[in-house]
Amino acid sequence: MNLYRRYGWELTLAALLVLEILLFGLSNSRMLDINVLLFSTSDFICIGIVALPLTMVIVSGGIDISFGSTIGLCAIFLGIVFQAGVPMSVAIPLTVLVGALCGLINAGLILYTGVNPLVITLGTLYLFGGSALLLSGLSGATGYEGIGGFPAAFTDFANQTLFGLPIPLVIFMLCVLLFWLLMHRTHSGRHVFLIGQSSRVARYSALPIARTLCMLYAMTGVASAIAAILLVSYFGSARSDLGASFLMPAITAVVLGGANIYGGSGSILGTALAVLLVGYLQQGLQMIGTPNQISSALSGALLILVVVGRSISLHRHLIYEWLQRRRSRKASA
């Protein structure tokens, strides 16, 4: 009982995930093939790598919608640095530093101006996206081709396995463990929850708000850089549009995973399960031949249904009291 009370939403998501796979398996038996399930994660798991630190940002009461542009900027930066003759062993750490710098720019602007994080990161979304396009143009990269010619050892990395699992999935699982420990087993994680519940109380309690926010946005930038590196390795080319479609799926996964969009509550494990739920929904719909427009609409409908259902569950006592009052008024009338 205590387990369900503590992880009730996560268990619900896990049950929905199993049910989803079984239902799609009735239409296409390939959906029940364990190898298909494992290796199809490479198509969407990078969204999850970014969604994990984004969960902590949202729990703190903030938001970052610039990570898609950060991915594109880091990807094209990696390609340009490689083109310049820098070894991959140096280019990859430099790319991670660029991602961290993007996150710190977001945090610095939010702390310095006091403007809503949504507005700040909307601005940096265009700043980083425009910078990626500018670098892409200067490097001579064209359209969908991007910058290629990477070493085989690098392009094979994201397509290899470790203990029978795809490398991107292994990295995602390690990130889940890392962020779960950080959020639920450290003082920094408790600070994130307290800041999200009331930034004013957190300020009066002398919590390190500035340091915590810098850490959160920097981690989102680093995760974006890691996602960019994996995507470049997976596709074999560096393009400025690699993260363009990540925004809505990542935010959907965070909200679906149980995070309060206004801050104060959230779950790393819930986000991880929601990433798989949304990812396999898209994969399953593609396998049964559903057009992309319909699959996107169904994903949005799923989010709305789950959010409404969760809201009803959280406020069921208030709803019950309201119904009781209505019955009492009708009886007295």
Curated annotation (Swiss-Prot):
Q: One cellular component GO annotation, for this chain's record? A: plasma membrane
What's its membrane topology?
A: Multi-pass membrane protein
**Where is it localised?**
Cell inner membrane
Main localization is membrane
Which InterPro entries does this chain map to? Answer: ABC_transp_permease
Looking at the UniProt entry, the stretches that span the membrane are 7-27, 45-65, 67-87, 90-110, 118-138, 162-182, 212-232, 240-260, 261-281, 288-308
Keywords for this protein: Cell inner membrane, Cell membrane, Membrane, Transmembrane, Transmembrane helix, Transport
Q: Does the keyword Transmembrane helix apply?
A: yes
One matching Pfam family: BPD_transp_2
Q: Name one GO molecular function term.
A: transmembrane transporter activity
Family per UniProt?
A: Belongs to the binding-protein-dependent transport system permease family. AraH/RbsC subfamily.
Q: What does this protein do?
A: Part of the ABC transporter complex LsrABCD involved in autoinducer 2 (AI-2) import. Probably responsible for the translocation of the substrate across the membrane.
Q: Which NCBIfam families match?
A: PRK15038.1
Subunit structure, briefly?
The complex is composed of two ATP-binding proteins (LsrA), two transmembrane proteins (LsrC and LsrD) and a solute-binding protein (LsrB).
What the entry lists under PANTHER family is as follows:
ABC TRANSPORTER PERMEASE PROTEIN YPHD-RELATED-RELATED, AUTOINDUCER 2 IMPORT SYSTEM PERMEASE PROTEIN LSRD
* UniProt protein name: Autoinducer 2 import system permease protein LsrD
Q: Native species of this protein? A: Yersinia pseudotuberculosis serotype O:3 (strain YPIII)
For this protein's source organism, the top of the classification is: Bacteria, Pseudomonadati, Pseudomonadota, Gammaproteobacteria, Enterobacterales
